[in-house]
Regions:
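A beta-strand/beta-hairpin structural motif
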Residues: 48-52, 103, 114-116, 124-142
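N-terminal onset of structured domains
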Residues: 25-70
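Glycine-rich, aromatic-bearing surface loops/beta-hairpins
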Residues: 139-190
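Bacterial N-terminal signal peptides
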Residues: 9-20
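Short structured motifs
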Residues: 32-38, 58, 94-96, 136-141
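N-terminal secretory signal peptides that target proteins for export/translocation
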Residues: 1-7
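Structured domain cores in non-transmembrane regions
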Residues: 60-125
Length: 190
């Protein structure tokens, strides 16, 4: 009886310990999310502006220091809600940046993979700050929007490790190497 009670108690306590350990691990995990985003018309083009929080895990920082690049992917969708029909997709845009470390120059290099533009930074903090501020990114032509209608703009960021074969990524603890934000959605009315 006593042994059964001890075994039962152990099985009742273990789930609570697992929940506490998970909460502790999540509390220490660096913040990764979208803090703010908006679009504004400029010169006939709607432009995206956003501020991201790009906290890297220790594993991602170590991989970066060893020369493995990280890729930031920004997915943007614009849709028009309709009453009795499915939403109409107006535009989709995927923007990609690669963050790498150049050991020879001792610089962190950010490359916009869509345009080829690149910049070098002295520290990882400077490079992450530059990546975290999306400014005047052309999203869609104003002629695609109807005046007075309401549109939903959705934004999601993904940070993943690059340069490793898929077979190797599967062997690694995936949560450490890829992070995805929830969709950040807001309405606009041209």
């Amino acid at each position: 009886m006593r042994r059964t009670l001890r075994c039962l108690t152990r099985w009742m306590v273990l789930p609570w310990l697992a929940v506490a350990a998970l909460a502790h691990a999540q509390a220490e995990e660096p913040r990764f999310g979208i803090r703010n985003a908006f679009v504004e018309p400029r010169g006939g083009v709607w432009q995206l502006n956003a501020i991201l929080e790009l906290g890297l895990s220790r594993a991602a920082e170590n991989a970066l220091a060893e020369g493995v690049p990280l890729t930031l992917i920004l997915d943007t969708e614009v849709s028009r809600g309709r009453r009795f029909l499915p939403d109409e997709d107006v535009a989709e845009l995927q923007q990609r940046w690669q963050l790498g470390y150049d050991g020879l120059a001792q610089r962190y290099v950010v490359v916009n993979q869509n345009s080829g533009a690149q910049a070098a930074y002295a520290s990882l903090g400077e490079a992450l700050d530059a990546l975290a501020r999306i400014r005047e990114l052309p999203l869609l032509d104003e002629s695609l929007l109807q005046a007075g209608r309401r549109y939903e703009v959705s934004l999601r960021a993904t940070l993943e490790i690059g340069g490793l074969p898929e077979a190797v990524k599967v062997l690694l603890f995936w949560r450490e190497w890829s992070r995805v934000t929830d969709w950040y959605t807001w309405s606009v009315r041209p």
